[in-house]
């Protein structure tokens, strides 16, 4: 089954990408995988504090996922999958695509300012020399 991979964050672009992925997956018999990434800046503190911050970040991602999962189940009849990774965003996106062969499309929201494709798209394309392992859909 082909999965649409969406990167979770707090931006309006994420919501647009998620909505698009849910509709496309529903219409094509696919699935949606939501990737939450805990950035290195969130847990590079003293050991005890860093662990507490990591746990809080994971809980925050899981709480957001529950909201989006409920919406997706009610609107599109899909149950999305949550994956949580730790590290630099572009690196973790590429690692997830490589580790999950069912990921067929990366869905990202466009930069709302209209000034370039956005930081994650720029990082991914720059790192891969313009060649990504899966097609990318950028949702306006």
What are these model-derived regions, one by one?
Residues 97-140:
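Gly/Ser-rich helix-loop-strand patches that form or flank binding pockets
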Residues 33-35, 81-85, 137-139:
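General small-molecule cofactor/ligand-binding pocket signal
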Residues 41-42, 90, 115:
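Generic structural signal for helix capping and beta-alpha/helix-loop junctions
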Residues 73-106:
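Structural beta-alpha unit
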Residues 49-53, 98-101:
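Short, hinge-like loop/turn segments at secondary-structure boundaries
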Residues 2-48:
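Small/aliphatic-rich secondary-structure junction motif
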Residues 51-63:
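A short acidic, glycine-rich active-site loop
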């Amino acid at each position: 089954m082909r999965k649409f991979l969406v990167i979770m964050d707090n931006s309006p672009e994420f919501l647009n990408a998620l909505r698009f992925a849910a509709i496309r997956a529903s219409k094509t018999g696919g699935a949606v995988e939501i990737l939450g990434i805990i950035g290195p800046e969130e847990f590079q503190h003293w050991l005890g504090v860093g662990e507490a911050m990591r746990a809080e970040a994971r809980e925050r991602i899981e709480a957001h996922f529950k909201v989006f999962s409920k919406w997706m189940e009610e609107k599109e009849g899909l149950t999305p999958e949550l994956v949580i990774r730790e590290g630099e965003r572009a690196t973790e996106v590429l690692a997830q695509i490589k580790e999950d062969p069912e990921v067929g499309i990366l869905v990202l929201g466009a930069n709302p300012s209209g000034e370039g494709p956005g930081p994650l798209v720029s990082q991914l394309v720059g790192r891969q020399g313009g060649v990504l392992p899966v097609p990318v859909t950028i949702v306006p």
